[in-house]
């Protein structure tokens, strides 16, 4: 660091990392003192606030201040302070009951403190991981959120995850082991907990431990997780998380892990995850679309594996790009394209990041990459070469060239000599073409990306700079008024190159110096063209301006403003022009200036469009060299204006002379220059202002106001005066300065030498003189007018206001902010809440008049006068609103302007940055811009402003305007009002009562406009403060009830749609933004300990609290908690009062109930009165209210739930087995006791009570948790079967209602109505309601509900059945803790009920019953539900009641068993035995269901690492049995037709028919399991393959029967499966065998299978040489097949495999085909002699055709380029054009395809052929036979 050495002395500490741009500000010397004072204040006050336990407002206020401090100064504090801040915030964030909005605020600050992890090492800081885990568990996996007891914002998940990422490097050494102990027991692959465990591990596991701790880090889990990943084949949801974890691990530990054995698998899976389409008729596996890998992480993983001794990764990467390159061609498009583009853009970016880390980054405590594994130059070159081809294709992609341009920018930093030439090759022709503008925009945006690498040349690419001038000259025609996008990209292109290069003519040096290199001499002579270029560019601009003049482009009637496009062109034009002039030498500048001056003076422009553009150009010229230019322009303009205004009549003209207006406009723009250069002309300028400021013509005085505004700004603001790319400019003699050395040179941060304009005393005097002369008289006039002493017309008032406004915005930073006393009593705090004053370069002069105060006094008086006397003068009111908001906020720059400048700065920085070297090596102009932005940021920082009386008055005025009569006035005033609300501390509390005043129903005098205005003020704007929903009890207690009561106001009318919409928006916004507000604000002791340390670290000790203060603080904290609870209850009661008012319109009642439902909490039970009201709402007339009540009552029941006692058990004691030695997952001796065992069911009271029930299904599968909890025996649990007297008041209310028959009657009636026909589903909210009832009151309500249930079940209507299903599910789940007697009675009743239900099941209701049973079985011990399972397994497929009932019973059964996963092997075996005889079912719906059920039966049979063989059914046994039955089909030769009649004929059918029926069911099973199981049983499926090949049809025809369609689908799904390396030979064997089959359909299908299989397992195949040869042999074999279709398919397959580089076109293959081509055919004569067999192709013809097909396949395998072997093959092919069919056909097709694919780039492809070859080729492609 250039300034790094002397910082500790200046500051008194060594700063961690400060924002360096602060050191370059003109007032930098004052900042250190300022920041030190602020930091001491923050440390003292933050520590004090925490010690006084005042979370709000104290801690919150000072943590915000710390956030602002970081934004202003960076991490400008010592390491010790940094650690203290982090520790304090960590403790604050993890306070258990902290309100969620505070937690998010603290978390965001903590993230920014930890963001730069190199600043704090593990030695400096350690953070525990468990508090974070507990917080995530509490919030992300909240048990009560779905019941509406907690409201979290949507952003909370992202914030928490980022927080964990930030803390992760600092977890202690033993964290990994503890995490594995915590989460491994959750890893049961059939359960949702697997997803949870893996995502926790991905988020928390630390991977950046130093090498000596690896044994405590990733070594503990690496092998286990990697083998798990390798053995999972069907992309379950959690696989993506594992990949993210591996990517991070690899990236943090480059060189410490050997990934080589896994590389083929990694690349195969990444390729599969791109979801590319292969082959013609592919069925995608549904779930793979959603669960593909995140490209960002995949790229990080690839990048981290590169380098090192073995080059396998680069080889695979090249293979990957070879296989997908053709997808990048612009003619291909699909939903996969975005992924491919992202891959292209991210890879180079990651490689650059890695190179930067290895070569340029400052070393820190993080583990460096070992020398042996760093990327070498050769590695980089190989990488760039492998990716270039896809990038060049992607340049013209349909989705735009942005990704390609970003990729090229990074690639050019690494290897310009490989990257830039091909881009230029595409650019030059694109600049010439007129017909393809897209080509031009695409190539130019790519050249802009590589501009810096091109211009700086460097050792790799010295000839780069020579291309610059030709490119610039050729780009000029792009400045084209008719093509907007072309115009903009050309401006950007020219501006980019001019910023990088000084436009100085150095051609004279050729004579003077002889020590120049060849390239330098070439550049010197080229620079002579610069002047020419600048002049031509100006001509183009002038033409553009003339064609966009107003008269040209619009009719008279249209708008006079600029259109959006015009303003963009204006911006592009002026910024490009100003860049060019900044970079010019003096000589060129003079010529240009002359030219602009003549153009501006010799024409008269209209002032709206073309005038603005010309004035901009002139301003740009004047800014570059103010002295010379002003000499030229200013006197000229002044003279013309004076001359034209000599006559006083001009003052009163309505329309002014065009020339006068144009000269005024020109003058007002050219005064936007360095203020001190204007001082010599001040008399002239003042005289002009006197003449023009009081024109009657609005256009005239507006331009004059602009002039005044610009004069004030130029003299009072601080800004840089030049942005040249080299400090000091270019006008040095060439003898001692050589400009070419500065081409593309970055700015040097430490020698920027910015020239600042800082206002001098003389300029200040001039500014005050202007204000005294022009502002004061206007204010006096307005003052008299508003006292009624002076008559003024509206136009005059507006003119006065316009002058006032321009004076204010011109001198914003000169005038001190408004003073006055603070508004107290809004909040009480024991900590000081002072505002921070920042110095922004000007010491305010308090001896002079503060015009801000004066304006505010006059304006308030005027405003009240206008509102009382002429409220319809809206234009004046608009101006007043503008002036008020500027009086409050404006200090020299506007927030929105700053934001857009910051945005464009970031864009330019990104498009030109050098990520490889880093270290802020940006061009000088950008760095200066950034320093200027830093200065503006300081002027705009108005955080935590004190709320003073002055502000209070103005805000009240704004509120009055916001509720005035005119809509537009209200709208503008509201925007200003919202901005101010966000600026002043606690002002909302002062204003809410005033806004609510308008909604009071008692008031008679409120108009509808005021009512609407007040509602809008409550609603707030997008992203700003919303008064209706502040996270604070005191505010909500006022606003919510007021909104509901306003329904009774006179001004409220539901006839007005705008008002109805407003209430809807308000309710919607409150529901969307409400977050649970805290009731408990206590601060734990841990925080206080750190706060004490922090306070001692602050140098000011005056703030240490007294013991009395501390005692008071504890008392206050208690009071605050009590007060919060009181407010909460008050709010609920007030809402109830409001909702129950008579005559309240229904809409408001609904909104009120909605508000009540938001107030449920999990730490405080709802007041009794509200419970009573909500329970009654269950039977409300309105459906929407009933729905809300159902959810709310379910939540109340959760609040009233009594806690059940748990106890710890030892699973090894229960099972009587010792703990296993090695790790074993799945069915082990020590978890057998959890399984369902029908011989040992708890069906007596003793058995039930002695049985240890484990409800959660995942426990015990993987390993046992450290502390295994189960429910304690019944005698320790809360009492069951209580009488009414034993209940609490709240419970009694619910009890009374549900024991009231009438109430229940009505409720059930309502619940069995249908809501939306055909759309209704099983409703989980209603289920929760019933579950809660039966859980809290056990069977108290059963007698009343029983008869209803029996009635509902007997009725087969959809809605009644659904209602029954919801209640039954609630009953079963609610009976979890009932005693045995009660449960037994319940099941006796339920079994009968369910039997009835299942026999009455219909199409509409079967899914509801399925959901019902699945919900009942979820997280329940199967032994508890044995009645249910025995019932369901009685006769799953009986055939009684028809096929439909069978299918439904199976569906319901499947729902129940699937929830039980691995714990019911016995039931699965029983079910399989039932089903096996029934597999030959005739009915399709039953077959499909059986297929699905089989999937679940075999799901548990997985081959994951360390898994014991399962007790559940095994696939292999089952397949063995099936194959025996399918034998008749295997042996048969003829094609299998589906000739089974759908209804069962009499008598036994033959074996064959039975086999066909069986086959259909098996196909359904294979299809169902493709997307669901984890591992594919490849070995088993292989045995079925030959049969599938036989059945599958060849053509795509939809009216094939079911069997054939299914066979085809199965083949498609199987071919996409992921193969493990051991499985590859097995598959190839089956394929070889099938290729010998007698059916050509089978041989044909083998080929389509190969295409997909090889592509989806590409690198696994390539890795194994034998399998590559096997595939090659198979295809060559089939190319000589006797069936024409098979030969053609084989050729297509070959071409595809060549294209993805699986096979290569080597000499051997070429020779093989050429030999086949030469096969002699029998003479034609012989064939014609009437032989019968002349239709059968002879063997020779087949061979010859095979050869031709081979050549054709090679040609078609490179559709987008011409490899060296191509011309010769085309010649070989042409010989066969006249061969007999089918050869002739093949040749023609090939040639026409070749022509189609190479047509686009024929010009460059032509180069590959010799002249003779071209003649033959032209002949072929246009020969007569082509059209024959």
UniProtKB/Swiss-Prot annotation:
Q: Which domain of life is it from?
A: Eukaryota
Q: How does it assemble?
A: Homodimer. Interacts with the 20S and 26S proteasomes.
- Which residue ranges traverse the bilayer? none
Write out the ranges of the annotated region (Bromodomain-like (BRDL)).
1635-1723
Q: What is the lineage of its organism?
A: Eukaryota, Metazoa, Chordata, Craniata, Vertebrata
Keywords associated with the record: Cytoplasm, DNA damage, DNA repair, Nucleus, Proteasome, Repeat
Repeat positions for HEAT: 462-506, 985-1024, 1164-1202, 1339-1377, 1621-1659, 1665-1703
Keyword Transmembrane helix part of the UniProt annotation: no
Q: Which Pfam families match?
A: HEAT_PSME4, HEAT_PSME4_mid, PSME4_C
GO MF assignments = lysine-acetylated histone binding; peptidase activator activity; proteasome binding
GO biological process, any: DNA repair
Q: What is its main location?
A: cytoplasm
Q: Which SUPFAM superfamilies match?
A: ARM repeat
Relay the domain remarks.
The bromodomain-like (BRDL) region specifically recognizes and binds acetylated histones.
State the name under which the record lists this protein. Answer: Proteasome activator complex subunit 4
| Record family assignment | Belongs to the BLM10 family.
State the compartments where it is located.
Cytoplasm, Cytosol; Nucleus; Nucleus speckle
One term under GO cellular component: nucleus
What function is annotated for this protein?
Associated component of the proteasome that specifically recognizes acetylated histones and promotes ATP- and ubiquitin-independent degradation of core histones during DNA damage response. Recognizes and binds acetylated histones via its bromodomain-like (BRDL) region and activates the proteasome by opening the gated channel for substrate entry. Binds to the core proteasome via its C-terminus, which occupies the same binding sites as the proteasomal ATPases, opening the closed structure of the proteasome via an active gating mechanism.
Question: Is DNA damage found in the keyword set?
Answer: yes
